[in-house]
A protein has these predicted regions:
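Acidic, Gly/Ser/Thr-rich repeat motifs that build Ca2+-stabilized beta-propeller blades
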Residues: 24-29, 34-201, 249, 257-260, ...
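Repeat-solenoid scaffold signature
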Residues: 235-270
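Beta-propeller blade signature
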Residues: 142-153, 207-220, 274-275
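Conserved blade-ending motifs and adjacent loop-strand segments that build the rim/top face
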Residues: 244, 355-375
């Protein structure tokens, strides 16, 4: 039995920090000018972390650091995007964003950059975005677009030439389980996209569509050569793996292995090694049960389906995760940190001889949507919901 360290992080804020947290943004339009954040936010120490705030946001969903810069770009579900220069504390807006189908779990989704385009500023680099797109007859689906990020001033950037390069197929009714997380292979030859089951379940076992799959594409969104179902034609030729439910984390580790983190039903959240041609079993098997308490056979009953590396019952409701590549947190290097929504926690995972173990859980007062590692090794964490804050975590002194 693994003994877990568990910490309660009391988020007691100084007056200066409370003032910073009160600086919100308008909820509509992509041309609103946010108030600047304080340039030197005051740190609060708690548990193993020292925390500073870098602004608050309107339903933040994803964040990415423009490689080689100090700017973190943050998507907001209603269809807006902001950025923070963490070296100065200044906040800025991004224009040129797509129309999104906002509602339920849908809206503006992930944001990603290419590491090979690292520079000292964020001007003139490729930006990838995902979002929920409306279709005919009350249908909708996830899409991925690509454009150029141009920053004309310290507080303003725009996305130019944005075009959709991939669409989830087919569009269906409902506003859940888009997934639409983005990851690039370490050599930057391939674009991987998590495509959720859209709460329709059975299509995740039907390889004639891309619901409940991870797709592998060229950087321009066309199907990559060598995919396992290429002979079946479009859209099956996009599929890398299937039998997924609702993936909210998609990351490569330092060895080049792709992992996904996904929501189970009632129980059965999963961390999976994503492998070519693997079927992860949803909805035929799960280590959880249906919301109406009907049982689902677990993975042990059907060995032809790929079992998770680790699962959680009760659920943690993951928002995202990141691998720890820096040395700032000492022997945590090579481990992973998960942002928990329902669990309101950061979950520390270790990798031991091919096994994944939960090493510790650090409780917060709010749902956590996103976590990423900065170039200096600090963790940047986004709280979920309206007014969700961006928190920078370093080891407590």
């Amino acid at each position: 039995m693994i003994m877990l360290k568990k910490y309660r992080l009391a988020l007691i804020l100084s007056p200066a920090t409370l003032a910073l947290a009160s600086c919100g943004y308008a909820t509509s339009g992509d041309s609103e000018t946010p108030s600047p954040a304080a340039s030197s936010p005051e740190a609060t120490q708690m548990g193993p972390f020292s925390m500073t705030e870098h602004g608050s946001f309107n339903e933040p969903w994803a964040a990415a650091i423009a490689p080689g810069s100090d700017r973190i770009f943050i998507t907001e579900k209603p269809g807006t995007m902001k950025f923070v220069d963490v070296s100065t504390g200044k906040l800025g807006t991004v224009t040129g964003l797509p129309d999104v189908d906002y509602g339920g779990q849908g809206g503006l989704g992930d944001v990603a950059f290419l590491e090979s385009e690292a520079g000292n500023d964020a001007t003139g680099r490729t930006i990838y975005l995902s979002w929920a797109e409306a279709g005919d007859n009350n249908t909708r689906g996830a899409v991925v677009g690509r454009g150029q990020l141009v920053c004309a001033a310290a507080d303003t950037c725009s996305v130019e030439g944005l075009e959709v390069i991939w669409r989830q197929a087919p569009k269906v009714t409902g506003r859940g389980h888009y997934s639409h997380r983005i990851a690039f292979s370490p050599d930057e030859k391939y674009l991987f996209v998590a495509s959720g089951d859209r709460q329709k379940m059975e299509p995740a076992q039907d390889a004639s569509n891309t619901l409940g799959t991870v797709v592998r594409l060229n950087l321009d969104g066309t199907p990559a050569a060598g995919n396992p179902l290429a002979a079946q034609g479009s859209p099956s030729d996009e599929i890398w793996s299937w039998g997924h439910r609702n993936i909210l984390g998609l990351q490569f580790d330092s060895s080049g292995q792709l992992w996904d983190l996904e929501h189970g039903p009632k129980g059965g959240d999963e961390l999976n090694r994503v492998e070519r041609g693997a079927n992860y079993g949803w909805p035929v098997v799960s280590d959880g049960i249906h919301y109406d308490n009907d049982n689902i056979p677990n993975h042990a009953t059907r060995p032809e389906f790929k079992a998770p590396a680790i699962g959680w019952t009760p659920v943690i409701a993951p928002g995202d995760f990141t691998f720890i590549n820096g040395a700032l947190f000492g022997d945590w290097k090579g481990d992973a940190i998960v942002a928990g929504l329902k669990s309101k926690a950061l979950i520390h995972l270790g990798f031991d001889g091919g096994k994944v173990v939960e090493k510790a859980r650090y409780d917060f007062d709010n749902r956590l949507r996103e976590v990423l590692e900065g170039p200096d090794g600090a963790f940047y964490v986004l709280e979920d919901g309206d007014g969700g804050r961006l928190l920078r975590l370093t080891p407590a002194s």
